Structures are given as C-alpha cells and as structure tokens.
Amino acid sequence: MSSETMIREKHDGALDDRTSVRLWLRLLTCTTVIEKRLKRRFADQYGITLPRFDVMAALDRHPEGMTMGQLSQALLVSSGNVTGVVQALLREGYVSMAASPTDGRASIARLTEAGRDCFTGLAESHHEWIEAMLAGVPREERVAMYDLLGVLKTSLAADTGEEQP
C-alpha cells in the first residue's frame, strides 16, 4: 500500500472539472494530518497544547511583548481564545503581563525566562517533527510547493468574497 492511500481523503483524488475543490480538499487533508500529529506529540511528550505552543512562538518572535489584540491578529484567532491561552501560560510561569505604557486598557504579554527556555525545547522538537513528516518530499519540490502556495495566497488575497456578475 502506498503512503498516499494510507491517508484517507474526502474524495478519490482524481482531478476533473472540480480541480479547485479537489486541490482545496487535498490541502485540507494534509494540514489536518500534520496538525493532529503535532497536537498528539506536544500533548504526549510535553503536556502542552498546540495553541500554547503557537502563542509562545508568537511571543518568541516579539521579545518586546504583544497585546492580546496583536496576538489574536498574528494567530488569526479571536481575542477571547488568546486570553485563555495566555492566562494558562501565566499560571505556568511561562508568560508575564505588564500594563502597556501607551494604553492603560491594554496589557503586554511577554515570555519569561522559563517560557523562553521551555519554548526552545518545544521549537526544536517541532522543527524535527515537521522535517520528519516532509522528509519524503525532495527539497526542490518543497521549494516549488512553497512558491506555488504563495501564488495561491495572492489569489486568496485578491478574492474579496463578493459575488461576481
């Protein structure tokens, strides 16, 4: 049995006049499989959720800290979702909160030293897991897929969602 048939898709994979829908379903299948594996590995090996990893990753990229609004925009989720995750990381000692010097209504979340140390290990494992999952795809093909997905991203940005005449 080939590795392609071991992962079930929502369609048979054949391309016809519904190429766009089938492409979207294949992208969804791949994304879902990768996400499920990451969730399971983070939970099993570190006792942490993927959303906590995502928040820590965003804060690691912004050592100056981020507001809940900035975090929600960066992670493409609601502020309510981010707040719960940040509160859990705060309880665990991985994140600190401080009042914003420019906006009294906002708080700035930052990784603590313990949070940075924890994230370093998480990020190394995350990188290794992704590399292992994509190891069967030659580097040149990964680069080509990345470039093609950039074209898709541009197409998505151009679609306003309004009905076309």
Predicted regions and their residues:
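Active-site phosphate/pyrophosphate-handling residues
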Residues: 22, 54, 143
